[in-house]
């Protein structure tokens, strides 16, 4: 039975790094086998991808200077410098002001965007 592949991008996030560190500690202490740790990481990849796909309700707008871009193995990578990221949150239930939307702007010196083919995990 073929299992669909999921990107391992989120293993480099804060929570992903913490999970990898915890699993490494358990392996080095002899409490779990490396094969179990790999299954945990594969499950993590799947759950994060599906959760983001199903539960994301925010919209981002990025404005800045494109510094570098590249495409390899169906993955685009963009480096944007001096950019402003506008985050628009849309909530399912209306907030007290009636609109249900909120917006915030974040200024960053350098932003890396990694865009993957969504068909890989289907």
Swiss-Prot record:
UniProt modified residues of type Phosphoserine: 95, 102
Record GO cellular component, one term: cytoplasm
Record keywords, A-Z: Cytoplasm, Nucleus, Phosphoprotein, Transcription, Transcription regulation
Database matches in SUPFAM superfamilies: Transcription factor IIA (TFIIA), alpha-helical domain, Transcription factor IIA (TFIIA), beta-barrel domain
A Pfam cross-reference name: TFIIA_gamma_N
One Gene Ontology MF term: RNA polymerase II general transcription initiation factor activity
InterPro entries in alphabetical order: TFIIA_a-hlx (IPR009083), TFIIA_b-brl (IPR009088), TFIIA_gsu (IPR003194), TFIIA_gsu_C (IPR015871), TFIIA_gsu_N (IPR015872)
Gene Ontology biological process terms in this record: positive regulation of transcription by RNA polymerase II; positive regulation of transcription initiation by RNA polymerase II; RNA polymerase II preinitiation complex assembly; transcription initiation at RNA polymerase II promoter
Region forming the signal peptide: none
Oligomer status and interactors: TFIIA is a heterodimer composed of the large TOA1 and a small TOA2 subunits. Interacts with TBP. Interacts with TAF11. Interacts with KAP122.
Family, similarity comment: Belongs to the TFIIA subunit 2 family.
Function text: TFIIA is a component of the transcription machinery of RNA polymerase II and plays an important role in transcriptional activation. TFIIA in a complex with TBP mediates transcriptional activity.
Protein name: Transcription initiation factor IIA subunit 2
Lineage start: Eukaryota, Fungi, Dikarya, Ascomycota, Saccharomycotina
Gene field: TOA2
């Amino acid at each position: 039975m073929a299992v669909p592949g999921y990107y391992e991008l989120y293993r480099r996030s804060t929570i992903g790094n913490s999970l990898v560190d915890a699993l490494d500690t358990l392996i080095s202490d002899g409490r779990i086998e490396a094969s179990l740790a790999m299954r945990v990481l594969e499950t993590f990849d799947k759950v994060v991808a599906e959760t983001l796909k199903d539960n994301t309700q925010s919209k981002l707008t990025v404005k800045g200077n494109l510094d570098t871009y590249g495409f390899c193995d169906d993955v685009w990578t963009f480096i944007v410098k001096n950019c402003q990221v506008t985050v628009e949150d849309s909530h399912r239930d209306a907030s007290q002001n009636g609109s249900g939307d909120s917006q915030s702007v974040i200024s960053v010196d350098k932003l890396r965007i990694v865009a993957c083919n969504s068909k890989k995990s289907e």
